[in-house]
Amino acid sequence: MGFLAIVLSVALLFRSTSGTPLGPRGKHSDCNSVDHGYQCFPELSHKWGLYAPYFSLQDESPFPLDVPEDCHITFVQVLARHGARSPTHSKTKAYAATIAAIQKSATAFPGKYAFLQSYNYSLDSEELTPFGRNQLRDLGAQFYERYNALTRHINPFVRATDASRVHESAEKFVEGFQTARQDDHHANPHQPSPRVDVAIPEGSAYNNTLEHSLCTAFESSTVGDDAVANFTAVFAPAIAQRLEADLPGVQLSTDDVVNLMAMCPFETVSLTDDAHTLSPFCDLFTATEWTQYNYLLSLDKYYGYGGGNPLGPVQGVGWANELMARLTRAPVHDHTCVNNTLDASPATFPLNATLYADFSHDSNLVSIFWALGLYNGTAPLSQTSVESVSQTDGYAAAWTVPFAARAYVEMMQCRAEKEPLVRVLVNDRVMPLHGCPTDKLGRCKRDAFVAGLSFAQAGGNWADCF
């Protein structure tokens, strides 16, 4: 690949009973907070799968979140998904077409469906919403405040892909970080603002650990699509039948059902800058139906990019190998998707930094989490019935890769330990580590953590890509 083509900026969150439609929603304020994420309509918004706004899982953590008093953090790597966005180009066309078809064929729009008669589809496509930008500012502030013993004097080294919503998310993270620093009277006043240090182009022409595109067999895989089709055929026909009975003249496919459900989260995160107004699409569906929708999106990511796809985890191997290099301050060893040109240079891949921040997409985060073995306890998901998070060992798309998802890899030094300890937090849930012996707080010794990443060290099954 041509090095000059790399773009660098180096100088640079109901009245509900099962089966009962949801009641009307009013406005809420203070929906989003730096510490807890999105807290409005939790019975509903926590069931939006990968379209859920980030919400803290601290209360679901099997281990305490606080750092013990005899320990101090010496290294942090945050890996984050971009903030809330509008639908992709293809989904924009599909959603608008479903709504237009209903408006053309329906002979009546009773009750809660009245808004559809004159509804004008006006969502943007692909880009961050104002709420999504605020999510990333909040993430920057959270990062600064959580690790202020370091951030008062040290800037994170920041990488992103060159996709607009990803790169802008990194920029908003920087804004939130720097604003928090400026409000901190204990911070070094002479420390310059951080910046987006590296922006890596997306596409099959570039090696990029923050975006999949190189593994040809994976890119043509239909495993995820097949799983989605299987479960859609299980839960959506009954919904289509109910909606058709409510909207005389309308005929709906199962895909139309999924499209209408998706309008609920997408419009909610687009209407206001704190997502305090719930879209009227949300009340068209029952609590049970939202549970099914949430599971559908979990299946999509599990079979598309996680352990349910034979080539899913290997898409995250490159980033896992970069993490090991950063933890040990040793050169990267990888023959998958690492950009060797960038990773060989201290300017674009320093090994002596203390704080790192990488920004990517939901799909890539799923692959990376599996490459790290974080969900090794998750058995193959059923494609015919809903499984709870207790049945999936803590995996669900809304718990794993919501809008503005964040994973923290922390290394800490403790008085009673000669070797530093490592733990991983996904959306404030301290993860059970599967590849190394853990203590009662869910931590592994650094060398054991690295040794446990044998799948990544061996390059996974990258050879099956071609």
Swiss-Prot record:
Recall the GO molecular function terms of this protein's record. Answer: 3-phytase activity; acid phosphatase activity
Q: How is activity influenced by pH?
A: Optimum pH is 5.5. Active from 2.5 to 7.5 with phytic acid as substrate. The optimum pH is shifted to more acidic values with 4-nitrophenyl phosphate as substrate.
* The UniProt record lists the keyword Cell division: no
Cellular-component GO terms for this entry: extracellular region
- Glycosylated positions are N120, N207, N230, N339, N352, N376
Q: State one Pfam family annotation.
A: His_Phos_2
- InterPro entries in the record, alphabetically? Acid_Pase_AS, His_Pase_clade-2, His_PPase_superfam, Histidine_acid_Pase_euk
Q: Which residues form the active site?
A: H82 (nucleophile)
In the record, which residues are listed under signal peptide?
Answer: 1-19
Transmembrane segments in this chain: where?
A: none
- Enzyme class, spelled out: hydrolase
- Cellular localisation: Secreted
- Could you list this entry's UniProt keywords, alphabetically sorted: Disulfide bond, Glycoprotein, Hydrolase, Secreted, Signal
* Disulphide connectivity of cysteines: C31-C40, C71-C414, C215-C465, C264-C282, C436-C444
The answer to whether UniProt assigns keyword Glycoprotein to this entry is: yes
The text of the family note is:
Belongs to the histidine acid phosphatase family.
Please report the name of this protein according to its UniProt entry: Phytase A
Give the originating organism.
Answer: Aspergillus terreus
The beginning of the lineage is:
Eukaryota, Fungi, Dikarya, Ascomycota, Pezizomycotina
